[in-house]
């Protein structure tokens, strides 16, 4: 199995070759529900794929969440990411990790 890692006191990550599974408390401090504290994320092959995911999601009833698509710096480096809430309120995202500069 994949050994767990932690980040702070309330974030736990399980990393494997196929992706990451994380358990965290909601960042906004509100109660955890299906739509707060849970995010389903998809790996994208390109920035264009992330933008297409976001545009199609919004066009089909999704709502803007966490701002416009763009670059974000995180503990694992820079990513290009887009979040939205689907019509049921679930938070979903698509993320592309650009190659590291050499």
Enumerate the language-model features and the residues they cover.
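Conserved acetyl-CoA-binding loop of GNAT-fold acetyltransferases
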Residues: 1-4, 61-63
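Short amphipathic alpha-helical segments
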Residues: 36-40
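A short acidic/small-residue loop/turn micro-motif
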Residues: 73-74, 97-101
């Amino acid at each position: 199995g994949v050994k767990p890692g932690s980040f702070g006191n309330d974030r736990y990550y399980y990393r494997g070759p196929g992706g990451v599974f994380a358990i965290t408390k909601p960042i906004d401090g509100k109660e955890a529900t299906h739509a707060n504290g849970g995010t389903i994320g998809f790996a994208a092959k390109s920035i264009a794929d992330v933008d297409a995911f976001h545009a199609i999601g919004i066009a089909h009833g999704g709502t803007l969440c966490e701002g416009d698509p763009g670059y974000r710096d995180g503990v694992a480096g820079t990513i290009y990411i887009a979040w939205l809430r689907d019509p049921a309120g679930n938070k979903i995202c698509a993320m592309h990790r650009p190659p590291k500069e050499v």
